[in-house]
C-alpha cells in the first residue's frame, strides 16, 4: 500500500506511522517480481518509483474516479515518465469522452505544464466501461458505486490465487444493490472507505463516504475474508488510528480487520 489517505495528503509528525499519502495500491501478481497493476494514482504513486528501484514501470493503472486525490501522483510518477516505460491508464468512461480528454481536464496547462502527450514512454489512455475486463492477466470487474461528484467504480481484481475488492470512496448508506453484493461476494480481501466514525456520520453523508461501521457491515454482507479499513481522514492522527485498531475487533467480532498503513504488504489468498 503506497497511500492510504483520502481527500488530501496529511504531512506532519502526527501522521508518520500510518502515512500521509493519498490513495494508491500496487498489485504484484503471482509469478511476477514487481507490481504490474496499480489502483488509483494518489500522491502515493510517487513512491512506486522507489519500489521499482530504478526500473521503468511496465503495467497498468486503473483510476476508481477522477477526483484530484486519485490523480495527483500521475505528474510525478518518474518510473512511468521514462523512454522504456509502458503505462496503460484506465479512467472511468463518461460523457463519450476519450480517456486522453478525461485526463487532460487536470493534466494540461494551466493546471500542469504539459499535456498527456508530453509524457515519455508508451502511454495509452483508455475510457473504462463497467463490466468484466482482463488487465495485466488479472480479471478486473468494474461496477458503479455511490459516491459524490462524478462516476465512481468499485473494483474487484482476481486470479487463481485470490481476490481483492477495492472501494476507496463509497457511500454504502445510500443503498447496496444486489449487483454490487454479487460482485463482492466471498471476496478474500475487501479494501474499503472508512474515513469517518459514527459520531461524524453527517460528514460522511455530506461528502459521500463511509464510516468504519458501514465498512464492517458491508464486509459481513459480502462474506469478505478480511476487511482493510482505508481512505483515512487527513485529520485522523496515528494515535486516533491506533484507537480504531484497538476497538474495531470487538465491533467486527470474527471478521479479521486491518487498519491500512502506508508500506503495508498483504498476501491475497483464498479464504
Predicted regions, residues:
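DG-centered beta-turn motif at the end of beta-strands
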Residues: 167-169
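Cap/insert and terminal regions of metallo-dependent hydrolase folds
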Residues: 171-262
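Binuclear metal-dependent hydrolase catalytic cores
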Residues: 1-165, 175, 241-271
